[in-house]
Amino acid sequence: LATGFFLGLKKFLPNKIFSEKAGSTKNVLIDSMLLDAFDAEPDLVGKIMTKDDSIAKQPIVFEESNGVKFPEEKFENYKGNQYLIPFFEQLYQLETTKKAKVRIAYFGDSMTDGDMIVQDFRTYFQEKFGGQGVGFVSITSESAGSRSSVSHEFSGNWKTQSYLNIKYPLRSFGVNGHVFFANDTVHAAWVKYKAGRSRFNTQLHNPTLFYGSAKNKKGQLTYMIGNDTIRKTLMPNRVLNTLSLSKTPLKQLKVNFKKADSIPIYGFNFDDGVGVHVDNFSQRGNSGIPISKFDVATMKAFQEQLNYNLIVLHYGTNVLNYGTKDYNWYDRSMTKTINRLRECFPG
C-alpha cells in the first residue's frame, strides 16, 4: 500500500530535495591566523592529499613515543602530581575555609558556543564549591540567542572587532578576544542581560562593566534599577577600567551608552565574589592561534581584576579537513599561544 501511495505521488515530488546552490556564509567565521599559519608551511602545500594520493590509502599507525607518562590515578584519589597542583590547592582552601576564590577561563570554539559544555562545567564546580553567577559576558555575541545561562540582547549599531579576523584592532582586545565601540552618535547603543534559568544563575550578581582607555571623557551610560534611572560617567583613564552598577543582585539589566565613541568596551562580569566562577570565551571558527596576539599589558590588567587560577584551551576541530596528516605547523602555532598566555597570566 505504501509503495503504491509513493508511486502515485512521485510525479508531484521535486527532482532534487536539496538545493545545489551554496548556502549563506553570513554566520560562517574563518580564522585568518589559522590560514596564515597553514600557508606559511611551503613544504606542506605540496603534501596535501588528492584522491589519487597513495598516502590517503595508508593505514594510520599509532607509534609509542617518549612523551610525558601520567600516573594511573583516578579522580577520587587524585594526589596532584602533575601540573594542576596550585589549582587543586586553591580548591582545597576553598573547600576547607569557605573563603578562597577560584576563577577559570575557558577558551573554546563552536563546541562551547552558547555556553554548551561550559555551563555544565560551571554548574558542577559551583554545586560542589559554591559560587553564583555566569561570569564574564561580552557586549555582543553570535550565539546570544541560543544561550540559556543568561538571556542576552543588544542593539545592532555596535562596532565589533574580533581577534579571529582582525590582526591590528583599533584598541587592544579584551580577555574575550573582542573589543566593542558605541560609535553611533545618533542612536544610543545598548545591551541587555537577563538572569538565566539554571540553579546558580538566577540573578545578575555585582554587574560590573569592563572598558579600556580613551581620550573621550564625555561617555555616559544609563540604566534602571526598579523605578530609578541611574546615570554614570565613564572614566577611561587606565588601560583597563571597571564600573560597578549595583551592589544588590538584579534579575535583568539594560544599559544604554551615550557619547561613548572611541571608548573600547569589553563586557560585563556577573558573580557573587565567592566560590568558583567560570568565564566562557567561545568563538566560532577559532583555532586558538589568535590568542597569541593578546596584548600583554591589557591581559595583566584583566588578571589583576579577575585573577584566573586555571585556563582551559578547547580547540582543534577547526584545524581538521586541511588535507594533511602533518599538524606540526599547528603544534608550533599553539606553542606560541601558550607562551603568550604565560606572559599574560603569570603565576
Predicted stretch roles:
Residues 9, 17, 30, 48, ...:
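Weak global preference for isoleucine
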Residues 1-41, 170-208, 212-221, 227-229, ...:
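Alpha-helical cap/lid subdomain in secreted, periplasmic
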Residues 162-172:
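Charged heptad-repeat coiled-coil "rod" segments that mediate homo-/hetero-oligomerization
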Residues 36-106, 174-176, 184:
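Membrane/wall-proximal cationic-aromatic binding patches
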Residues 27, 31, 41, 50, ...:
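Serine/threonine-rich low-complexity intrinsically disordered regions
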